[in-house]
Regions:
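Interaction-mediating elements
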Residues: 1-112
Length: 112
């Protein structure tokens, strides 16, 4: 019941599966939730402009049922994205969403 979704305007990514696994492990560790409930998405080549520029940038959504620590996680995930994709931290927006368990479905039911 945790999700990280990265949309970026650059197309080529070296070893995207390795990056998705790294993000999954990092999200599980930072939320204290089992990785068996973590989903990671990477959407490349999205038309995107940030601060009036087409330079590499990313929009990141991090959703979880509780266990979010935005100030710590913002630095952690900006650094991970910078190191993995070469996108400067000041060109990354992260939106955190603490989702009500009743609004998150899985396996034909909700968590709350």
């Amino acid at each position: 019941m945790s999700l990280i979704n990265i949309k970026k305007n650059i197309s080529d990514v070296q070893a995207p599966d390795a990056l998705l696994k790294k993000l999954s492990a990092a999200l599980a560790a930072s939320t204290g939730k089992s990785e068996s409930y973590v989903m990671t998405l990477l959407d490349s080549g999205v038309p995107m402009i940030f601060a009036g520029s087409e330079e590499p940038c990313a929009y990141v959504e991090i959703k979880s049922i509780g266990a979010l620590t935005p100030s710590a996680m913002s630095d952690q995930f900006c650094e991970l994205i910078k190191m993995s994709l070469g996108i400067s931290k000041d060109r990354i927006y992260i939106e955190f969403d603490d989702v009500n368990a009743a609004n998150w479905g899985w396996n034909g039911r909700t968590f709350g």
